[in-house]
Amino acid sequence: MMTPENDEEQTSVFSATVYGDKIQGKNKRKRVIGICIRISMVISLLSMITMSAFLIVRLNQCMSANEAAITDATAVAAALSTHRKVASSTTQYKHQESCNGLYYQGSCYIFHSDYQLFSDAKANCATESSTLPNKSDVLTTWLIDYVEDTWGSDGNPITKTTTDYQDSDVSQEVRKYFCVKTMN
């Protein structure tokens, strides 16, 4: 062991020794922190892979259940009526089994593709315990895209325009129509 002869030498030797220990301690901390970061990244990647696999399995289950429900509802709709055409894909609401058309705010809009006089369309809807749609009920909703140019309850065609239009000759003109049934 070396013994310094003056205070200056003693300080420099002691400082060098302390400085060396500090460097070794800092290097150990850096290594430990680096290892901890690597371990946390590996754990994060494993958890993301696991969660992705779980979500893929759940998505496949939901899609197959949804596909089966749509197939069942389409088969029921085809069996119930041969002259009706469903105007949209089967609606997934609580009334899906009893509405073979567009469901909106408690009403079922059933599309009839056969051209009828206004009186015949109104009578056909009455036999089904339903009515022709009111223009005011559908004008500001997404339904207007479907019911446009069909018979309205006032005997005129339902149109997007709000300008005055010529009254239709309901004794001769034929149109497609919707019957609106209130769902319970």
From Swiss-Prot:
Annotated keywords: Disulfide bond, Glycoprotein, Host membrane, Membrane, Signal-anchor, Transmembrane, Transmembrane helix, Viral envelope protein, Virion
Positions bearing carbohydrate: 134
Membrane protein topology class: Single-pass type II membrane protein
Virion surface compartment residues: 57-184
Family matches, as Pfam families: Chordopox_A33R
Keyword NADP in record: no
Assembly and interaction partners: Homodimer, disulfide-linked. Interacts with protein OPG190. Interacts (via C-terminus) with protein OPG164. Interacts with OPG162.
Family: Belongs to the orthopoxvirus OPG161 family.
Name recorded for this polypeptide: Protein OPG161
